[in-house]
């Protein structure tokens, strides 16, 4: 886990001042080939399509370990492609977003990622037609990781089966709070991570796993795997970089980062470059010019 943090941090540093478009294009090509390739191979049986049963609903993983892994890849790819094409094909991309969301609900039952794709679709539509209009709420977006990390960490730590409100939330998010509370009870939280911490997931098995204790929430999980100081440092970096993008007028990017921060209250990929490439764009050079973007929108509208 510490090695992962070191490698990911090095990538964050190595991408400083790199052209954001170049990074996104490379991500779309590499991740796109991987996801589409594995998906197709799972359809023809060359890669196992693990199917999970949740309350009578069959959830397909399409070649990945778990359905939410596949759904998360789709979410981040949709964000990357849509951001690259943010001034083009708005209704084609919007239709694709709706269809992709419906597909994920029907075949993966990954509700959060399906909802996140729909929210992303709405966000891209809004910014396409808003022509760079600034809303007061945008000033709060750079602090989204602080808010969402604090909420899910607090609720997980305070979770109790005797609290009906927290039990209701736990049920809504399929047991995430209970798993987080179990981690707090089982492992200590330290400044630089908990030694020998081990989260047991499905491990490629579709039946129930004895001792399952996998914590999905990125923020809660990283408290144990990376430690308090690295998590706080990452959040500070996020806030500083997001504030800079906000001051530069890159409101769409800040909104995307906020949506991802919300998604990672439940999902485990906030600081994983194979999924969330946007976290690693924080210090790249944003070559998506605000002025150019507004000019293109104005031309399209006429």
What are the residue ranges of the model-derived segments?
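Hydrophobic transmembrane alpha-helices and their immediate junctions
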Residues: 225-261
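Long extracytoplasmic/lumenal interhelical loops at the membrane interface
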Residues: 165-226
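A membrane-periplasm/extracellular boundary helix in multi-pass inner-membrane enzymes
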Residues: 128-167
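Membrane-interfacial helix-loop-helix modules of multi-pass inner-membrane proteins that assemble, modify
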Residues: 33-70, 171, 207-210
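Alpha-helical transmembrane segments of multi-pass inner-membrane proteins
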Residues: 26-46, 67-124
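Membrane-interface helix-loop-helix junctions at transmembrane boundaries of multi-pass membrane enzymes
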Residues: 85-95, 133-139, 241-256
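Transmembrane alpha-helices of multi-pass inner-membrane enzymes
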Residues: 257-261, 271-302
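Transmembrane alpha-helical segments and their membrane-water interfaces
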Residues: 1-35, 237
